[in-house]
Amino acid sequence: MQTKQELENWYEQEDPWDYTITEDDIYRKHFYLTVLEDLDGTYERALDIGAGEGFITKDLPAKEIHAIELSDTAAKRLPENVKRVSTPIGKYDLVLVTGLLYNQYDHRAIAKMATDAASKHVCIGGIVDWLRPYVFGELIRSFEFPYRE
């Protein structure tokens, strides 16, 4: 499993995943946000588990946005409209878990945290073969994107 120090080292470089300049990631972000707005318009409370620097988090359609991020370095780059929390605080209309349900993370604990914190929607994203063992409730929509090069 990836250590906190490895995460800190990874985030020494701003936008280490190149999300802000990779067309596939920009498209996926736009797609997620469009689907979420179509489902509910604006959520009261949203939680992004593993928010990183807030690439998607900052634009979530919610009045109150919380983020859980283990890397202090990444969390320092979270935008002002996002409040960092160490654990979920109550229930959230929307819980976002993207790129996190993988073996290098404690994926079972993350999946449990997401289902426990959600009162309405859980939006998950990642490599589909790694997502299959999880049940988050009724599947509303499912989409598959090609993995970026």
Positions of PLM-derived features:
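Conserved class I S-adenosyl-L-methionine
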Residues: 1-38, 43-52
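Conserved beta-strand signature within the Rossmann-like core of class I S-adenosyl-L-methionine
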Residues: 119-128
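A short acidic, Gly/Pro-enriched loop at the edge of an enzyme's catalytic core
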Residues: 88-94
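A short SAM/SAH-binding and catalytic strip from SAM-dependent methyltransferases
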Residues: 94-107
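Class I SAM-dependent methyltransferase SAM/SAH-binding core
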Residues: 53-83
